[in-house]
């Protein structure tokens, strides 16, 4: 029987989570976190209106972390895909990264959609109408192909256009379910697509995966300074959360005419783009993916852009990025994706 969001008695998303203390004021900038071991006792807590509340709240490690670690013990590499701003093509890039890794028949790939309130991965992967099946051992991912599986809240909606209007604890509970109860099996790569910004979903994924280890994050941006501004915040978040940064990708970097293959600069980099930012921040620049209208078409139809349009310069750029991500994780480029 497929799990449903309308069956809270069967799937209690909040049950595994410890109750967060009810604060009387917003958390200050350097707050250690109301559920941390230092809550209410750290130097930064002095003078905070929440100090007594946090100090008396129950503390301790999450008892489900060992279960998550055991479930993911057969996953070799875990990659987070992040973006500071929405609309830069992060989820689109996540699908192409997944298709790129799975183009190697010797690799098995999982794609987890943690954008709980805006799940678009199933549509892009062509499995929007599928549902999750449960077994005695957990939830089965929806398999796009023999070596590419997907998990998303979209599969659990009674109607595909239903809005998911959840606060943080319930979203965190579902993300924990995705990591603890999904039968990912033996994966070479688990790609985690996240919502824009640095919100509850990012904090939850990082805390749940810290024990099992994350290889790193791939940051996606466009050339404009308004996008780079938020990517700088994402870089700061990764460093504060001790998430390794595999590199940055500049998406929509130029426009490729599907007819003549000529590339034009539509979104010009006003301040040097992602390449300059990567140099300033001393992080790897993974590559620039040009804007090809057929990428959007492939996502609308749930097709692999890499398979449908192998002659596109964007396809070559994506394949190169896939190899570079593998190299940043210590793999050989040809081992990740052999040259055609």
From Swiss-Prot:
- Its domain of life? Eukaryota
InterPro entries under this entry? Mrp-like_CS, Mrp/NBP35_ATP-bd, NUBP1/Nbp35, P-loop_NTPase, YlxH/NBP35
Q: How is the cofactor bound?
A: Binds 4 [4Fe-4S] clusters per heterotetramer. Contains two stable clusters in the N-termini of NBP35 and two labile, bridging clusters between subunits of the NBP35-CFD1 heterotetramer.
Task: Please provide the record's keywords in A-Z order.
Answer: 4Fe-4S, ATP-binding, Cytoplasm, Iron, Iron-sulfur, Metal-binding, Nucleotide-binding
GO cellular component labels: cytosol
GO MF, one annotated term: metal ion binding
Positions bound to [4Fe-4S] cluster 1: 31, 45, 48, 54
Kindly list the positions annotated as binding ATP: 84-91
Tell me the cofactors it needs: [4Fe-4S] cluster
List positions binding [4Fe-4S] cluster 2: 257, 260
Q: Which GO terms describe its biological process?
A: iron-sulfur cluster assembly
Q: Does the keyword S-adenosyl-L-methionine apply?
A: no
The listed locations are:
Cytoplasm
Q: What is this protein for, i.e. what is its function?
A: Component of the cytosolic iron-sulfur (Fe/S) protein assembly (CIA) machinery. Required for maturation of extramitochondrial Fe-S proteins. The NBP35-CFD1 heterotetramer forms a Fe-S scaffold complex, mediating the de novo assembly of an Fe-S cluster and its transfer to target apoproteins.
Could you describe the subunit structure of this protein?
Heterotetramer of 2 NBP35 and 2 CFD1 chains.
Q: Which family does it belong to?
A: Belongs to the Mrp/NBP35 ATP-binding proteins family. NUBP1/NBP35 subfamily.
Protein name per UniProt: Cytosolic Fe-S cluster assembly factor NBP35
Q: Which organism is it from?
A: Phaeosphaeria nodorum (strain SN15 / ATCC MYA-4574 / FGSC 10173)
């Amino acid at each position: 029987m497929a799990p449903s969001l309308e069956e809270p008695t069967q799937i209690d998303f909040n049950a595994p989570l410890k109750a967060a203390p009810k604060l009387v004021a917003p958390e200050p900038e350097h707050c250690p976190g109301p559920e941390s071991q230092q809550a209410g006792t750290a130097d930064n807590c002095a003078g905070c209106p929440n100090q007594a509340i946090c100090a008396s709240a129950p503390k301790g490690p999450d008892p489900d972390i060992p279960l998550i670690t055991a479930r993911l013990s057969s996953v070799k590499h875990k990659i987070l895909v992040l973006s500071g701003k929405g609309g830069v093509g992060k989820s689109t890039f996540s699908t192409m990264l997944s298709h790129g890794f799975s183009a190697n028949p010797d690799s098995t790939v999982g794609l987890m959609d943690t954008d709980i309130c805006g799940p678009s991965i199933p549509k892009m992967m062509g499995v929007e109408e599928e549902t999750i099946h449960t077994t005695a051992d957990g939830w089965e991912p929806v398999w796009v192909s023999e070596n590419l599986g997907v998990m998303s809240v979209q599969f659990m909606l009674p109607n595909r256009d239903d809005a998911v209007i959840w606060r943080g604890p319930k979203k965190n509970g579902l993300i924990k379910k995705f990591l603890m109860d999904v039968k990912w099996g033996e994966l070479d790569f688990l790609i985690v697509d996240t919502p824009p910004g640095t919100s509850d979903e990012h904090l939850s994924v990082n805390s749940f995966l810290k024990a099992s280890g994350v290889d790193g994050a791939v940051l996606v941006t466009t050339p404009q300074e308004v996008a780079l501004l938020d990517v700088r915040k994402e870089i700061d978040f990764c460093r504060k959360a001790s998430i390794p940064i595999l590199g940055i990708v500049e998406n929509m970097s130029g426009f490729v005419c599907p007819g003549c293959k000529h590339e034009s600069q539509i979104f010009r980099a006003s301040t040097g783009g992602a390449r300059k930012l990567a140099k300033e921040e001393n992080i790897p620049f993974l590559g620039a993916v040009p804007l090809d209208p057929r990428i959007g078409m492939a996502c609308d139809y749930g097709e692999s852009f890499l398979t449908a349009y192998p002659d596109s310069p964007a396809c070559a750029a994506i394949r190169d990025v896939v190899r570079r991500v593998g190299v940043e994780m210590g793999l050989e480029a040809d081992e990740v994706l052999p040259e055609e």
